[in-house]
Amino acid sequence: MSKKYEHLFKFIFVGDSGVGKSSILLRFTEDTFTESYISTIGVDFKIKTVYIEGKAIKLQIWDTAGQERFRVHNNSQYRGCHAVMVVYDVTDQRSFENVAKWIQEIERYARDNVIKMIIGNKSDMISQKVVDPFLAQEFADSLDITFKETSAKQAINIEDAFISLVKLCIDRIEEFKPSSTSSSTIILKKPQSQKSNCIIN
């Protein structure tokens, strides 16, 4: 039986705990949002198919824990990854400062040609914003990484961010071909994960 999609891409979310990775994932895959979403402990993933120029593209999107104590368990999740979304909270300066550390981790564990995107989430919280988007853009430009501000709560730039990444992956599909065997056999078995209650916008 032939596959029903043109390409399969594996995306991963990384970033500090509480920045809204799970909320972005829920907004994109299910178009839902909740103020009291339970945070991820360990790893979890969702599957979504998008259509680019009439072609079906299947996405396997991994949501990882932001806590330092779980990071060692997450390193293996970079295997076969095509793109990584590094998320920070625009109302939390420390989460933005830690973006550099997350990028260092990506460069250490992910494939050399992995595509990266920096996302400043919770852009709807204008009065509480502390991270200057111009500085964030400047930082991203210095690393030749795409930058976008999003709001999972108001569904701002969520789909645009994912579609942009998909198009970048398609444009660079030839670079991924040496790893196509491993990436095309990604195990879709849902990993064991636990949840703890917290508020994430």
Curated annotation (Swiss-Prot):
Maturation-removed propeptide residues: 199-201
Lipidation (S-geranylgeranyl cysteine): 198
GO molecular function, a single term: GTP binding
Pfam family for this entry, one: Ras
Gene Ontology CC: endomembrane system; plasma membrane
GO process annotations (BP): hypotonic response; intracellular protein transport
Motif Effector region: chain residues: 37-45
UniProt keywords, alphabetically: Cell membrane, GTP-binding, Lipoprotein, Membrane, Methylation, Nucleotide-binding, Prenylation
Protein name as annotated: Ras-related protein RabA
Source organism of the structure: Dictyostelium discoideum
